[in-house]
Amino acid sequence: MSNEFKIKNIKAIGLEVPITNLSTPPESLPYYQELKNIVFGSYKSVIVEVEEEGGIKGFGECMTRIAPSALIDIIYEVMKPIAVGKDPLEHDLIWEEIYGVMRQRGHSKGFYIEALSGLDIAIWDLAGKLLHKPVSKLLGGKFHEKLECYASSIRFKKPEDVVTEVQKVLQEGFGKVKLKIGRGVDEDIAAVKAVRDNFGDMIKIMVDANSGYNVNSALQVGKKLEKYEVLWFEEPIPPDNIPGYAELSRTLDIPIAAGESEFTRYGFRELIERGGIKVLQPNVGRAGGFTELKKILSISSAYGIPYAPHTGSSSAVTMAAEMQLAANSPDFLIYEYMNNAWSHEQPNPLNYDLLNEKISPPVNGYLTVGDADGIGISLNKDTIKKYLI
């Protein structure tokens, strides 16, 4: 084992930004009222800081939708004792040891893997900084200097309001946009039809139901969407209904996209082999970090399935990490650029103020991937102090 570098310390930093003016989720979504109060009441993040003996620090992010304290406790009580003293260049060994400790004890998904994901991203970021290389090079090199983006997401609105939002997206240089659906067949189709009628082929459309349908209603919606040349139908049903995904994939002519709710190569193997999805959407801060995403993307590549990273409402740390991973993937399809926060009146400051190095917005629908060490970031101390839990 190499003793050239050693991890000296690990910190878990919980951040929360209350949302004061929030749009209510549509009543068609399962437990919509609970979603509003628990999930959508604030922007949350857990940032992981890994420090090497020489004082160099790497940063990662755990996908955090609820209970940041759970992630923080897992990192401190389970993962820190294992990782401290290890060589950050031996990320695979660290990952497997941490995963293996709890795998047989019922913790192969959920908070445990989200915590491991954030830690793993931070270790890779640290490794890149120690070696003075971007993570994309450590992963094997850049296939893409620029990443095509789609605008995400136009949320639940009346058709005329959706048209207004799409006009803004076009003016910002995007050629593709994702619409949130899940309100019911008639309302969903009316919104998609309004966009297609007003803009024709000027804009490409994806739709995302966030698991708002069952198989029967998803089939109804999907059949009606086919005539509007929708690029993909995302998370039409709950993520644990693998047979349902298989039925939708067999029956509909629209590619089924999923993956933001899945964990590790084992979960994605089932989603791909049994679920038959056509677009893979893992989140690096949930599915297992860089170490595990390399394995996941090897499986999807063998099946010829394109990769469209999920960023969602995570912070700029996840954005930076996903850019490095996407640049390295020969199967990269398109990048989710969140130009619409959960609250239009209150953009997420963890996207714009958290980093000292700002991520430049897309130009004509493309992001440029940088070559800075690691994932190319450091944290703004004032923002951390302001939103620290």
Question: Language-model features: where?
Answer:
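Shared catalytic-loop signature of beta/alpha-barrel
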Residues: 26-29, 223, 229, 240-257, ...
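C-terminal extensions of enzymes
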Residues: 345-389
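Metal- or metallocofactor-binding catalytic centers and their adjacent structured scaffolds
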Residues: 9, 51-130, 345-346
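Hydrophobic faces of well-ordered beta-strands that scaffold small-molecule active sites
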Residues: 58, 149-152, 177-179, 205-209, ...
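Metal-dependent enolase-superfamily TIM-barrel catalytic cores that perform enediolate-based chemistry
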Residues: 140-252
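Glycine-rich, aromatic-flanked loop segments that form ligand/cofactor-binding clefts
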Residues: 51, 116, 120-156
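Structured beta-strand/loop patches that form or line metal/cofactor-binding pockets in enzymes
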Residues: 2-54, 59, 63, 352-353
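Conserved, mostly hydrophobic/aromatic
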Residues: 7, 55, 79, 119, ...
